[in-house]
From Swiss-Prot:
Predominant subcellular localization, coarse grouping: cytoplasm
Recorded name of the encoding gene: ruvA
Region Flexible linker, annotated ranges: 144-148
Protein name: Holliday junction branch migration complex subunit RuvA
GO molecular function: ATP binding; four-way junction DNA binding; four-way junction helicase activity
């Protein structure tokens, strides 16, 4: 098992990034909560990782801290929740907000995440509440000021939302509603998700 990787970011486009470690490029899938903390390409970063091995693929998932990784591991143990949905949850409302929803049994907010129906939301609360009640974190994502090296942040943001399960029209409408110029892709994604999932 690969516990963590320290290397140089070669490129990043949510939800994927390429990390070079000792001359080897690792393709890593990460939630948007992790992307909010990533530095610019060519800078060094430490990512906590989780490797999932299947017959047709070896997929490496990366996280900003161990709290995110532990939450991811707890999510994929829930019946009906796979890695893709776990990433959508972490990307949609973030680790701290998810813990808050579970501890307060806020089913209505959980079902606003693409792929999470009422039954799944109820299972998430039932199966993770005891474990999450012992978790605490003050590590809140703060994407403001982060810049994307991509020259098409709007298109990148729309693509990332589609990768999370939103329809193209929904993704475009959410991004278009953010009438603020010169924002990075990461900031556009965060603001769009805040509007769609949290309703603010």
């Amino acid at each position: 098992m690969i516990g963590h990787l320290r290397g140089i970011i070669v490129e990043k486009q949510p939800p994927y990034l390429l990390l070079e470690v000792a001359g080897v490029g690792y393709e890593i899938t990460a939630p948007l909560s992790t992307f909010y903390h990533l530095p610019e390409p060519q800078e060094e970063i430490l990512l906590y990782t989780h490797l999932i091995v299947r017959e047709d693929a070896h997929t490496l998932y990366g996280f900003h801290n161990d709290h995110e990784r532990r939450l991811f591991r707890a999510l994929i143990k829930v019946n009906g929740v796979g890695p893709k949905l776990a990433l959508a949850i972490l990307s949609g409302i973030g680790p701290d907000e998810f813990v808050h929803c579970v501890l307060n049994q806020n089913i209505d907010q959980l079902v606003r995440i693409p792929g999470v129906g009422r039954k799944t939301a109820e299972r998430l609360v039932i199966e993770t509440k005891d474990g999450l009640s012992r978790w605490h974190t003050n590590d809140t994502p703060s994407p403001e000021g982060l810049r994307s090296s991509n020259t098409q942040p709007t298109q990148d943001a729309i693509s990332a939302l589609m990768a999370l399960g939103y329809k193209p029209q929904e993704a475009k409408r959410a991004i278009d509603a953010i009438q603020k110029p010169d924002l990075s892709a990461e900031t556009l994604i965060r603001l769009a998700l805040k509007q769609m999932v949290l309703g603010t």
